Amino acid sequence: MTLLMDYMRGTRANKKGESSQTLLSPLKVDNFGKQVRVGFYHHPDTGMLKGKYSSGPMKEIFGIHHMKAHVFDNNLLVTGANLSEDYFTDRQDRCMVIQDCEPLADYFDDLIQVMTDCSFNVDNNGDLRMLPTYPEPYKEPKKFRNQMQHHIKYFRYNHKTEIPAGDDL
């Protein structure tokens, strides 16, 4: 299982001191180890912010990860907001379920894996670490962008598909 979320939102603690990182780290540390990946994507531009915009919710305005795709087997759920009860009862027009579409589910699963590779990952101690091949995005943003661009190009090349004439989408 892979969980990918935004670094700024996922590490920001609530009034109780809880964050997505503190709530999800036990999945990796105590329970499932190598069966679980928990990644926090950190946009490289947020490291350049200074002063009153350098922490808290204000920082999220300048660079937040908004991919909201959920892959289950060969099914894909694309949403526009949180996975909350209110969202699925009052705002059903903002989600789409695509069932039994293995190529699309594989595409999104691979995209999530690539983005998780480019993210801070919860290690076996519950700490956030980049993979050894990646620089930290806020310390070396240019190097990070170049590495990520290469990774995304490779992903796009692997998923390049030609649709035969006469086939419907």
Briefly describe each language-model feature range:
Residues 1-68, 72-169:
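Charged, low-complexity intrinsically disordered terminal segments
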